[in-house]
Amino acid sequence: MFKESLDTGRTSTFWKGNEYCFTTGQFAKLDRAYRKHCGPTAITNLVYTLAGKEGKPLSEKPEAVFRRIAGIGGKRLIYMNTDFLKLFGGTSDILVPFMIRRSLRTFGITGYSVRGPFPATARRICAELDRGAIVYLEVHRHPVYGNHHMLCYGYTVRDGRLMLRMADGWVGRVHDLPAGEELFALCTVISRQKG
């Protein structure tokens, strides 16, 4: 953990009040049933959050938006709706930025850059959040989530401990997740384009 970020009270809350937190449970039984669909769920949260922040809320129901996003990933083999042998399926860590870009274009959300994936360190996550970005976080072998994709909207430091403001796709509200470097894998950064 990096020392300069551990000042108690330090926060990044640019997105507070605009965060969406749909869950995988809301979409699991759609169509033929979705499996390993945390990636499309996180991107659905992202699309709703950015559209709301831009003052152009989506008129489509979340289920319709989710289906379109899962379809975008499925057509490009970025998202596979399978859980073959509990090993294969879900959203590709490396290709998720392409799925995010295409999803934003599909819903008319412009003016944002999608960069990554990068190694997800506390320093990088906090620096990007301080710049007003949203961080799409991918964790591997997490003690609670296992392999999982979710959104990070901000952070706070309490008692020297970094707490990330997460839409984890499991809980229908934003909540704080204690951060430890060993828990992070990759991150993709979604931020306002400069100029």
Residue ranges and their predicted role:
Residues 1-89, 158, 194:
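Active-site-adjacent structural segments surrounding the nucleophilic cysteine of cysteine proteases
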Residues 34, 39-46, 96-100, 121, ...:
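Stable alpha-helical elements in mature extracytoplasmic
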Residues 37-39, 133, 141:
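Tryptophan-centric aromatic hotspots in well-structured domains and transmembrane helices
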Residues 76, 107, 132-139:
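Short secondary-structure junctions and interdomain/linker hinges
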Residues 83-110:
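C-terminal domain-closing interface element
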Residues 106-122:
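Catalytic cysteine-centered active-site loop
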Residues 122-124, 128-131, 138-195:
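Active-site signature of cysteine proteases
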